Amino acid sequence: MFNGIIYNSGSVEKISTSKNSSEIILKTNLIFKKSELGSSLNCNGTCLTITKINKNLISFYLSKETLSKTNFKFIKIGNIVNIEKSLSYGNKISGHYVQGHVDTCASVSAIKVLDKTWIISFLLKKIFQKNLIEKGSIAINGVSLTISRIKKNIFEVN
């Protein structure tokens, strides 16, 4: 469980792909102890299990299902990934509870800048619209945001 407040990121160092899965290696400035092997990490909103730790490099296994539903299908070496360690008892919750169970990807359809506010519109398949509520929470690339408006197959955050 995460809260969607992202303070850290990692860069994609290596991607190994097979027919049904991939392994990704991220370089990060976060410190991971060997005891955190097997722990969950919010990576761009997807709950992934740490499979290897080597100093500042961490590895993850991505199943065919994960690749089909997340933006990891588009990831390339050098890309930056939002990362957040899982919540611990007593942690402050500033965003909303983020489980990291991703249903689909949306695409940016428009960005409007009004004074100091950005309104970002996303195009979403109609089948997933039923899961959205105006003023409800959504995690986009792991970041906790509030849905400001829903219309047809588009939703907005700002």
Predicted regions and their residues:
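Conserved loop->alpha-helix
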Residues: M1-N158
